[in-house]
C-alpha cells in the first residue's frame, strides 16, 4: 500500500477473497488500515463462504470503510458475494448510511437477475425471498393485528412488497 500510495493511488479495494473473515477480524483489519492511512479511500469486497458477507460489510463500514462491493442476489463465485439487498438494509438500519438505492426496486432487480442468470432466489432470502414477508397464523400475525406490536424496520412496503398471511 505504501508504494502505491507514494505513486498517487488514493483508492484501494481490500478483499476477503476466500470468504474466511468474520466481523471481528474484518473490523480489526479495516480499522488498522484506516488508522494507518487516514487519507486513503478503502473499499471492502466480501465473499460469503461462511455466510458472513453482509455482517462483514457492516463491520468494515463501522470501522471506516468508505465503499463496498455487492452483487444482486449475492451472485458470485463459490458461495457468492454480499447481497445488495441485504447490505442496503443492514447499512441503512444498523449504520445509518444513506445510499442512492431505491429500495422499492430491489425485488424487481432481483427477479430480473434470477430469470437471466438461472440462479433461483431462495424463498427465505432476506428482503427479496418469496416468503420473507409472509406471516403464518400465530404469534407474529397476532402482533400485526395489535397495532404492529412486533414492529421492526423491515416492513414489506419499504421494499415494494406486501405482507401476506398463510395458514400453517
Where do the model's predicted regions map?
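Alpha/beta enzyme core
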Residues: 1-40, 58-65
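Glycine-rich phosphate-binding active-site loops on the catalytic face of alpha/beta enzymes
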Residues: 16, 63-80
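C-terminal helical cap(s) of enzyme catalytic domains, especially alpha/beta-barrels
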Residues: 76-106, 110
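A mid-to-C-terminal "edge-of-domain" accessory segment
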Residues: 96-168
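Active-site beta-loop-alpha junctions enriched in small/polar residues
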Residues: 1, 15-19, 45-51, 73
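Hydrophobic faces of well-ordered beta-strands that scaffold small-molecule active sites
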Residues: 12-14, 40-46, 68-70, 87
Amino acid at each position: 500500500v505504501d508504494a502505491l500510495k507514494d505513486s498517487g493511488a488514493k483508492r484501494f479495494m481490500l478483499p476477503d477473497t476466500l470468504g474466511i473473515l468474520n466481523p471481528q477480524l474484518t473490523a480489526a483489519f479495516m480499522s488498522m488500515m484506516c488508522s494507518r492511512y487516514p487519507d486513503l479511500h478503502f473499499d471492502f469486497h466480501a465473499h460469503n463462504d461462511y455466510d458472513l458477507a453482509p455482517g462483514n460489510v457492516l463491520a468494515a463500514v463501522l470501522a471506516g470503510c468508505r465503499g463496498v462491493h455487492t452483487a444482486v442476489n449475492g451472485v458470485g463465485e463459490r458461495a457468492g458475494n454480499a447481497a445488495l439487498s441485504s447490505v442496503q438494509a443492514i447499512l441503512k438500519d444498523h449504520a445509518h448510511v444513506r445510499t442512492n438505492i431505491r429500495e422499492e426496486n430491489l425485488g424487481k432487480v432481483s427477479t430480473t437477475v434470477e430469470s437471466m442468470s438461472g440462479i433461483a432466489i431462495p424463498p427465505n432470502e432476506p428482503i427479496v425471498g418469496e416468503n420473507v414477508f409472509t406471516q403464518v397464523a400465530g404469534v407474529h400475525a397476532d402482533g400485526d393485528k395489535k397495532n404492529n406490536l412486533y414492529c421492526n424496520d423491515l416492513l414489506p412496503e419499504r421494499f415494494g412488497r406486501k405482507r401476506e398471511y398463510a395458514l400453517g
